[in-house]
């Protein structure tokens, strides 16, 4: 396969639909809640993962690279998504994994990446941190690869995420923040009166700094559209407590889509609290972007 065609991926992207949902006692005359179902795109490269890879795949083809190389931790959904989509498109791929004490049998994610054909290379944390943001043409063991930074956090990833909310007419769009790639793409696409609510899932994550790094001068023009709810990380990445687990379980019992406690559960919890804290004179439409995160592995 020598050329990139958007049709290669569109059969998956069109599965993402928008529908209304409910939080008990929160859907009233002031709010209508909707969800963008990017979790339906694919069981392994679902959510924002394929969107962040879309234009990186185009760059791989345009630069006539040998393969794709990317970075991730031991439980990285980004590594899994990259391995899966490269398997689908028959593209050689390498995953640089944080932690030289690991191997491909350390967990089900890494094992599945290997099964899909991804060559895994395990680096010490210090060496990994030095190269995890590498992007663009990158020579590795004698071959030219297109390097995608950890989490897909590059310009190509941002542009792929712009498409999440194109042509939408919602007043507020709320999304999880891990690397700020998805939220940066959405911010670029907002219309004049739209605002975006971001919920960092990492403790101490500097949303404004990370988004400015990705967007450059464009960020200054758009930053007033941004609302940061940075108090709902529950202690940090993948950290939870009984209150969050109870909320997620109750939500999943009463809705026709699932959330989880690492990303989407924290966003939904934050949305619930935010609705309680605001008072608008006019009705508002809110879009919750479901970024996936459920791999069943």
Where on the chain are the PLM-derived regions?
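PLP-dependent amino-acid enzyme catalytic core
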Residues: 1-297
